[in-house]
Amino acid sequence: MAQPRIGQRVIVDVPATTANLGPGFDCLGAALDLNNRFAMRRIEGGGERFELIIEGSEGSHLRGGPENLVYRAAQRVWKAAGLEPVALEARVRLAVPPARGLGSSATAIVAGLMGANALVGEPLSKEKLLELAIDIEGHPDNVVPSLLGGLCMTAKAASQRWRVVRCEWTSTVKAVVAIPSIRLSTSEARRAMPKAIPVSDAVVNLGALTLLLQGLRTGNGDLISDGMHDRLHEPYRWRLIKGGDQVKQAAMDAGAWGCAISGAGPSVLALCAEDKGMAVSRAMVRAWEAAGVASRAPVLNVQTTGSHWQPADDE
């Protein structure tokens, strides 16, 4: 195992994720077929040097430097492998907009981990990368499906070991993700939540989560509709999203089975049958337009393969 050559380059594709899906707060997430692409290469210089090049206007506020999430994740790999840090450049084709509830920070973490690991011959297993990703992010619901793909339920067992269960999401269930031009930080969304919740609310969520998972497995719209309800976080977060209630109602009126805040928001996730996808998409965009917010609402599939890397020619 050796340090990467100057100019050595890898390309890492990392999917967007939608977390919580209503009742699965901080434990349930799914990868979507919308990817950020990171072209990472070693450049001249020692550790603490990281250059970031963003393709796309959404990331104009993002900066390089040693505190960047991509580079912080890369440093964790090198430390675990017993290697000294090296200077890196990342050129990012940004399709997952930041601060929209689609796991953009998870894509940065996973790309940094996977890219750095690939550059030094993959000394760390995927299980170790997963452990590092959760530790950096602080919660598993985005980084786990971002790395592994599909619909993932993650929980910390009594042994303190993270356990991941891949759940089935039938292809007949489509995800419409309405992505607004407004932003909402995860920290702000978390501050809106209470420190404690009633036991009755926790019980409702446990039942709803069971119904939702069965509905996603079978494509049963009634189960999805009954399961896509939450009392832990959404009652406190919808008020932070301008026009959010109207967007949710528009999606339901257009035929969606259920609707939820995607991650911490402000994007809104609607689940529906394939033949309802475009109608739900148009209705959500119109509702946000009426609230004075520009948006787009792609109809997406669940991405089942997760993140992957490929070698690229040296530069």
UniProtKB/Swiss-Prot annotation:
Gene Ontology MF, one: ATP binding
Reactions accelerated catalytically: L-homoserine + ATP = O-phospho-L-homoserine + ADP + H(+)
EC number of this enzyme: 2.7.1.39
Record keyword Kinase present: yes
Pathway membership, UniProt: Amino-acid biosynthesis; L-threonine biosynthesis; L-threonine from L-aspartate: step 4/5
Binding of ATP, residues: 97-107
Keywords on record: Amino-acid biosynthesis, ATP-binding, Cytoplasm, Kinase, Nucleotide-binding, Threonine biosynthesis, Transferase
Gene3D superfamilies: 3.30.230.10, GHMP kinase, C-terminal domain
Cellular component annotations (GO), alphabetically ordered: cytoplasm
Location relative to the cell: Cytoplasm
GO biological process, one term: threonine biosynthetic process
Entry function: Catalyzes the ATP-dependent phosphorylation of L-homoserine to L-homoserine phosphate.
Family membership noted in the UniProt record: Belongs to the GHMP kinase family. Homoserine kinase subfamily.
Designated name of the protein: Homoserine kinase
Organism field: Synechococcus sp. (strain CC9902)
Name of the coding gene: thrB
